[in-house]
Amino acid sequence: MRTETDEIRDNLKYLALLARDYPSQAAAASEIISNQALLKLPKGTEHFMSDLHGENEAFVHILNSASGVIREKVDAVLGDTMPEAARAELATLIYYPTEKLPQLKERCTTEDALEQWYTQTLLQLIDICRLVSSKHTRDHVRSCLPSSCGYILDELLHAHFEDHDKDLYYGQIVGSIIENGRADRFIVRLCELIKHLAVDKLHIVGDLFDRGPRPDIILDLLMRHHNVDIQWGNHDVVWMGAAAGSPICICTVLKTTLAYHNHGMLEDCYGINLRHLQRMAEQFYGEDDLSIWMPHTDAARGPYTQGMLHRCAVMHKAISILMFKLECQVIDRNPDFQMQGRDYLRRINWNAHTVQVGEKSYPLRDTAFPTVDPADPAKLNPDEQLVLQKLVQSFRQSEKLQQHIEFLYAKGSVYHIENGNLLYHGAVPMNTKGGFAVEHFEGRRYSGRALMDYCDARARRGYYGAEGSAARQSGQDFLWYLWCGKLSPLFGRSAMTTFERLYIADPATHTEVKDPYYSWYNDEAACRRILAEFGLPGTSHIVNGHVPVQEKNGESPIKGGGRLVVIDGGFCRAYHEKTGIAGYTLVYSSRTMSLRTHQPFESAEKAVRENLDILSQKNILETENHRILVEDTDEGEVLRERVHDLKQLVTAYQLGWIPEARCEDHVW
């Protein structure tokens, strides 16, 4: 029978490495005590958001406001002493400190008035910060403080007043901050600290990219966030493929951005050069009837000149035909994708100007195909080859895009399990009988969790596979499949009917049939089967995005008897009319799980100027019988393992198997 001593002896190599960080019994014991104390703290608050679709202003505001949590803290601290309008103004200062601060200072017409405002505001922010920091250890709060003013903020937040006057103490420190011209800096730092501490973990359940104006701003913010994970959406993986240099993914990304007149983001933010594409487009399509290629526009982002619209439309047509050619090639290379019926350029009757879809033929809305050889429709002409070469080079050499996509790979996955919640963007493909759909890839069968794991691994091949290797090519093709494939867990529909919507007038061909999953996820037993497939008990939750909840028509985001929550509420401006709302945030605190429903957001400029907040309705989904502590979470399991290892290290020191460092600094 193995003893604890046997286990320690087996772990000596690891314990010797651990001893580098804790070189004495005292140091190890101190860390044990610290970790055991952490286990008894309340669980940190988690926020879940999905389907941001590049809508940066709404996302930034919801991130800054912590989905309404910060306003609740302001009201809790100051509700009895401060009028509503003043609380709204203070909340706006916390959300946008660098933008709001100059506006508020302008009101102070004298030095005395400014000093009084500084004093009042600093004290109010300190009180709010003390509240939001109460769930954290002092060490954790210290680690969040900027080095330039961390010591003073630590004193302000953690001072005790048993034997001295609080007002006098605070007054002396705040007065010194103002006197030395540091008030602005301290206000900004306190606002940032409040936002940091209000949300412990952020989960983004897919689709950062799409038609919205600035996905790059969203990714810049997420890269600076202290604790975030991402579950890839189908819009994300096609950008991942584009950054990897996949021609089909590059064309797909360009087609979407041009269809919504958002190519300026590609040019200005990512430095993608569209000059060669524009030149080729004008050469072959400049005189065509471009009526079906005109971009969708947002009046709020206009005005648009005819020249701007023409430039966009002609590139839209050029890149779409290039994309349809490449789709034929990818389908040829990957028969296991089972997409042979979607090589539409090969299904056109060039004499009758019709295309065959299934068993029927339909007239084409646009019959001009000057770059297509009817004898070999998938073949690129020399001009298209040159354009594609330049585009691949531009996407591969975009430093900012590569940083963003590496971040998506580092922080992202097809699914994620944390604290009893299963997170994924699209679906776990199912059949009509409620079982998991079976797919065959590379000679093997996959379904359920195994399919999701396979998709994750092959998606990584497309970016990290060796240059020029078959594995890299296969992975890039698969990233495109994840975008639009029939059994893609990120797509969850029968087909992406892009060709049909462009070229065929009959709306019956535009239908994208949802995976049976979207019927079965209303069934509690089916949701429990999904949870069991991922090793979770039936009391856990599934957090799902991808399909906008039509709340205005009475649809509920709560499915499967409360086991599943759909959190796609339509962040994207284009979906507001469809959903009747402007997004959800799921909030999981130590006491409750709640869903916050957001109303449309006008603009950051108006929010700063008029103290306008996003109106959000809070709906409690579950209330815990007892407050959830860190020891009840996945983090708690990690901490317990850490304590176990440290206790073994202490024993190894006591047995003399690992020598202690002789340093008085470790005596306590």
Regions found by a protein language model. Name each.
Residues M1-W668:
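Feature recognizes metal-dependent phosphohydrolase scaffolds
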